[in-house]
Amino acid sequence: LRCELDRLLRVAHPKAFPYIAIIDVANTCNLRCPYCPTGRRQSSGRNKIFIELDTVRRMLDDVGKYLVSVNLFNWGEPLLNPKIPEIVELIHSRGIWTVLSTNLSINNKKVLEDLCDAGLDFMFVSISGSSQETYEEYHRGGKLDLVLENIRHIIQYRRDNNSKNPIVELKYLVFKHNEREIEAAKKMAQEVGVDLFRCVHAGGPEWAESELGRGQALLGRLFGAERCKQLWQALVLNSDGGLAPCCYLYFKEDDFAEYNGNDIAEVRQNEKFVLARKLFDASAIRDLPTDLRHPCLKCTLVHEQPHLREYLKENPEAVRGHRTGDA
């Protein structure tokens, strides 16, 4: 509650600690999704592909008591990390909810069973079509039949072990080119036995032209600009131990700090974090340097804040780009 109050009041120096952790356990992927920098094989500048188990353990020792859930995904495919079952088991042993998002186009039934045994609570499985032809237009290199086979295997393994976990949600990434297959995908989800089915916008150039994209744009105009939540709610840890302010910053150069077993609470009070929070507080605009150089100045959320319009016009560093920081 204190964390949410700090967020609503846009407190620059929050007293409460984030209750969500986002850990990028694998900075690599087996697919080549065109709107993802990892899929495009764009270097993030990081020297470690997989996060180390000891790094996760140190983080939990430091802040685990505050965490409600840990999302074990961000820029890569988490199932490629050979330690992923151990990471899930470690977090689960602390009584923390574990969430994983995967393309599930991977030929490894053993890791699926190990994740179930480790106590994984929730699994998102992303697809972008009900036919292979449509699916592979975005999920390049993926095999839809393999994804569905793996889902069936997880569901059957749950039944065999009298377990309801992990809860499996089939997440349909919506683009203009695949809206026509949404209904077929819903039926497919029922047939394979997933617990939940959901359509989500996929971003990218096509998103603004899709029906869902136009609907979200209208909501934004009606209810005002969205403000950042992750600066208060989330702890974001990259595969090499870099600490980011949110899950949208991809490049190493945009990290706010390094985690080497140091005090995370203290790190989150450094100048970069404080200035980022002040960007969303209209009363703190006078505290912002006129020539501020900051990764958040590329963020679409920052550029949508009414109180920053004049400030951003006058700052040559404030070039609007993608929320990954890719201008």
PLM features: residue spans?
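Short histidine/acidic/glycine/proline-rich micro-motifs that form metal-
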Residues: 76-78, 105-106, 172-177, 254
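Conserved C-terminal portion of the radical SAM core fold
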Residues: 65-73, 93-101, 117-129, 145-214, ...
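Short, well-ordered alpha-helical microsegments
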Residues: 81, 107-110, 178-182, 244
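Generic structural signal for small/hydrophobic residues in well-ordered secondary structure
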Residues: 21, 25, 29-30, 52, ...
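C-terminal accessory region of radical SAM enzymes
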Residues: 156-167, 191-192, 196-226, 242-306
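Conserved alpha-helical substructure of the radical SAM core
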Residues: 1-122, 133, 137, 141-149, ...
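Short loop/turn motifs at secondary-structure junctions and domain boundaries
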Residues: 14-16, 225-229
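Cys/His-rich metal-chelating microdomains
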Residues: 28, 32, 39, 231, ...
